[in-house]
Amino acid sequence: MATGVYQLPNLLALLPKKPGGDISPHFKEADTGYNAWVHKKLGWFFAKEVYNAEMPLLAAMAWPLASCQELRAILAYMTSSFMLEELTDRCSSTKVVNNSQLWISTLRDTEGGETSRHPFIKTMRKELIPMMKAAVDPFHWPQFIASNELFAKNVIREAFVRDADMNENAANNIQSYTVMRRETIGTRPCFVLMRSTRRLYIPDDVLAHPLMTEMEDVAIDMVSIANDIYSFKKEYGDNGALTNLLTVIHKDPTTDHLDLQERIRYATKLFNAALDRFHSCRQKLPSFGDVALDRHVSSYADGLIDWVVGNIEWSLVNHRYNTFVHEKDRQNNIMRLNNRPFSSQHFVLFIVLSILFGRLPVQSLYRMFYA
């Protein structure tokens, strides 16, 4: 294969069809309503980022059984999560702590953000959280909040790791990266929303069963691996894909000899292993002593498949990643990569701002180019 041209895996061929169907029939209605809201309520710069993310398409593909109201609630949460990323992505760990705590306290109780003047928090409190509460089943709301509390804590942890420059402990080892990514990708709250849309009333003690937790963990692993494969081209152009599984594989001492094509194959093997573990866990699930509950557990496993497949479908067609140059490349899973890392204007701007605001130590910059 030519230089700079890479064969990506056909991950969809490895997976069963979505039990919930291809896409929510309410996609167009939710998409139109959400984009009108974004245009009216959000500032131009942030609105552009939101449009580019194509969140309505992801919501409709990953939650195919969701009603229009539920899709709007899911989009409200996605927007809130996007806001958390903006509040924590380019600031000190101290600021991350403050902003994450403000974000979760607002989500937990809208009065928690009442004194904040930040436009994101105001929008969450007045617009987004009411949408969520109107659609999320009361049974699932406590689980939803608990999953977001864990998510916010891990966003803080990730910031401290980044500030302490502990990459050798957090991002240079495949296993450590996988464990950390499970809690920072933000998928667990989405799974709670999925249980709500499907009316799956699974109590906490059943969710805590070892086979249930492993099944959920490996589903998240599949989402994470797929995201890192399909977003690699974008991240490579933005910042050299500093925090991406394909980069971590290159840094891990056991796999640092692999070139990029071999790393893609290795990531595919990790995906296959996660899928095998998912099926194994599902087959071994015991009865929980109630026919209706057992049916809900089985439907939850179906929902996890919907989510994994829907996320991949979205990754293949969205304009945020732009993984493929044209339709023929998409059909053949061909990625064309500019072999000059760190050449994009986005990355140059990232470096300049990082140095100016003290967010990138000189030693990290040296390693970035010469390690």
Task: Pin down the residues of each PLM region.
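Alpha-helical, largely C-terminal catalytic domains
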Residues: 1-371
